[in-house]
Structure formats: structure tokens, C-alpha cells
């Protein structure tokens, strides 16, 4: 009989720490519902004391999902734990995730403390959280660089204090796979009472070993893994949920199963990528667009003769539909709703109406609208909610002449117009926009991505600007790349307005 591995998803907490990937509460609920359908056991919904937005998101996610455990992160601080419990009040299944740094680097430089005092604080935090909930997870931050003997003392102490799960993070992504295996194995063999708690992995990808370390941790006895969709996360990211799930599905002989419905992996990946404006690299394992593509003649010949010559997974096992429906201007609202549902997105009727209006405009500009376009439309911010909107844009450009742009903006229902010339159409359009906004934001990053294939593609522009020492991120999408660029800049302006 197979052993059960619990999947703890931290896309909405650790994953959302990526610059430019912040979600609003409605989007977080959308992701949480998709994670529930995917079959994750635990959803880390946020760090409630960090901001009112995180606090509110944990509350609303707790209301929106039914069977997964909803987890809230805290430091080993009583006030953090108080606030976390308040945020979890509507959760059907609650978990508080508290902890403290245990490496000598953290003890000395972060806390200016001693090993003995850290254990005292760890025990106190665990006992305090236990007053609120039965399910308490304790994290030993930077466990990867904590010596095993001291780490075992901390783990034993918090289990005695009531921890039901103990998280052993490779916070800096420093561990080698064998080293991480040995660490988990050491704890399994040297901690008194280890059977009263589940050991959890939480590995970062700074050296590209997050999945290998997580897998080795499972082989050594960990029975919870902390992962994110697409491996997103701080710095180089976290262990990918899809990689661990499919490793275990492909290697059934290991005798370890998860509750993941793998056919939901690809739709969930696409939805998260779209909402967070973070493209999945083409060669990403499991969910990259090239993951099941074959360009070598030898490989193509083999696959045509028998798919198992070069494919160890059926694309349908991860939810890739080779017979994806292409929508046109004649497609109805029901067809759009169906394609969104297939891709893991279920919208309320009012939002669906607005997305359908955008779809019709796009369908008039393109011959065909595919799934990537549909997800882009669903993930785009609703313009009606923004203080600044693009009314019109006209650009004149050509070889050997300066580009000229005229732009019209609607700002809080007041109309403004301006014109400017520049070195190219995008430069001219942004200069005209700046004449109206009168805020000299500095462009720090500008990237263009094709959403799909073809000369009538939707182009997606990601932009980062700096104003008064703060960074703001925006994106725009349109079949016209100049319009997409202006929309991205306007998105940055609206993000600035929202935060101020």
C-alpha cells in the first residue's frame, strides 16, 4: 500500500513575494479555488500581520475554499500569532505556521541571540499558537545551514511543545541533495517523539536543486512538501508542485502517492502565469510549451512510430489538450466561458461579461483567439476600476522621420489630450502620456512577449518604473505593440495611485 505525501502549496505566500507578481484579493481567491480543484492538502494563504491586504486575503480565502487546510504564516511573536488566528476565523481547517531562524548566521546576525534562547522562543511560540489551534507547524528557518545536532534539539523541543508539523527549510538553496537527505534522515533517527509530527521540506532553487532536494527529503522520510505552481518564489524560486507530483506519478514503484489531480496541473499553471504576469519558460519541465515538443528528426520519427520512444508522460495526464478549441468573432459567451473553465478560470457573471466584451474586440482584430489569448484577457485588470484610462492613441511613424503620437486619457472622468515626437512610436507615445501625467517616472525594465503564434498575435508588455525611490510594475496586452506599451505604462501609474 502506498504512503501518502501531503502537498503544502505556498504560491499565495512565498510565490507572491516575486516582484511584480502581487495579486489582489479576488485574484488570490481565484488561485485558491484552482488549488482546491488541483487537490492540494494545505494552502498557505498569506502572512496576515504583514499588511491589511494579506490579512483580508486570508479571511476571504478561508471563506471561499472548503476542504484544504488554510495556513497563515507568523514569526515567533505573540502578536503575529494573535493576528493570524483572527484572519483564520472562517477557515474550516486551520493551521498556524510559526517559526524562527536556527542557523548560527541567523542566531548571531539576525537575532543577536544564543542557541538556548532560540529554543526557548521556539517552544514559547509553539505553545502560544497551540492555545488557538490544534494544527501548528513550526519552521526552522535556514535549517539547511543549521548543524544537525542542534537542529534535532530544536525539532524535539517544538514537538514536545505541540507542533504537529516541523518544516526543515533550505532557505538559501545551499544544500546538496545528499546533504539534505542526510539531514532529514538524521532527524528521523535522532529526535525523540519524531513519529508524533510530520517532517516537511521547503527548498529554494538558488543553485537549481530545489526539486532534487525536496525529492531526497521525501526519500529520507519527509511526508509533506512545500511547493509552488511553476516553481515561482523569492529569488530563484521554490520547488515546483508539478515536478514533484509527476515524479511520483511516473515512478509508482516508489510507493508514495499524492492527492493531486494531475490533469489540472497545466490549466492551473497557465492561470497562475497569466494572473501573476510571469511567463513560464518554454523548456520548463511539465508545463513549458516545449515540454512535449520534438524538433529532432530522429525524435520525431520515433514518436510517430510509438509515442513511448521519447515521451515518459502522456500530455493529457497533466491537462494538455491537443484538441484545443480556437475561438473566433462568431463564438458565443458560452464558448468563452467553457474555454476559461477548461483552463481553470471560473468568473462571476459580471466579470465574464466584461471579459467577453474584450474578447469580441480582440476577435475582430485577429482571425483566431486561442487559449493563451483568453487567459490574458481574463487576467488583465478591469479598466473601469482604474483612475487613468486610455481614451485614444494615434501614432505616425516611418523610415527617416521622427515618430509623432497623439494621446487621450480619461482621468477620474476628465478628458486630457497631448502630443509629442520621439525616437520611434513607443517613445513618442510615452512622452505624450508623460505630458499629461506630469510625473517623471523612470523606466527601469521593458519586455515584450508574444502571447501566441502568428503575425496578428497579441503582444504583452511588462514594464517596471521607478518613482520617488519605489518600483511599480505594470503590463499591457494588445495586437498593437505601441498600444500595449502605453497600457503597461498606465498600469504602472494606476499601481502608484492605488499604493498612495
Which ranges hold each PLM region?
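Alpha/beta enzyme core
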Residues: 5-7, 17-42, 55-64, 78-199, ...
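Non-catalytic terminal/interface segments that mediate subunit docking, oligomerization
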Residues: 17, 22, 30-31, 368-472, ...
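Short, small-residue-enriched loops and turns at beta-alpha junctions
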Residues: 14, 18-19, 47-52, 103-105, ...
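A mid-to-C-terminal "edge-of-domain" accessory segment
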Residues: 4-5, 11, 246, 253-419, ...
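Short beta-alpha connecting loops at secondary-structure transitions
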Residues: 67, 169-171, 226-234, 249-258, ...
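A glycine-rich helix N-cap at a beta->alpha junction
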Residues: 67-74
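Catalytic alpha/beta core domains of metabolic enzymes, predominantly
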Residues: 175, 182-305
